[in-house]
Amino acid sequence: MSCLRSVFLLLAALLAAAAAFAQDYTAGAIKVSKVWTREVPGGAKVAAGFMTVTNTGKVPDTLIGGSIPFAAKFEVHEMKMDAGIMRMRRLEPGLVIKPGETVVLKPGSFHLMFIDLTQAPKRGTPVKGTVIFEKAGRIDVEYKVEPVGARDLGGGHGHH
């Protein structure tokens, strides 16, 4: 067992090194990729986080929260059209990712809310944070900061 464990740990370390390079993060059956946020005007009290989450396992898992250094609160939200009105609500306990499913957190859909900001994300300065899953646990991630109005990672062509 201990020999297997050390091989596993070595593999895990190698995978982690590769993942950091590719900006993919895994824990258990959960894979997180394309992690980003947008610049917000100075003085803004909220910012949003986006990412792609894949559940490679056989059971559902739930994105229940996380943290980012410059926000007092971190919530999982959903935006959707309801009778022609865009409504945003907090998901309790969180966002369920079904087995084999990939969920994209993006503007106008599911997203993370960073609330009560002490400082604003700045373009070109990646921000480290964590996301927490009910089963997979805590995953350390790094958010790439895109310009205001970006619709996706590396988009940067949003209209103002």
Regions found by a protein language model. Name each.
Residues 23-160:
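Compact, glycine-rich, soluble single-domain proteins
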Residues 1-9:
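Bacterial N-terminal signal peptides that target proteins for export
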Residues 9-10, 20:
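Cleavable N-terminal signal peptides
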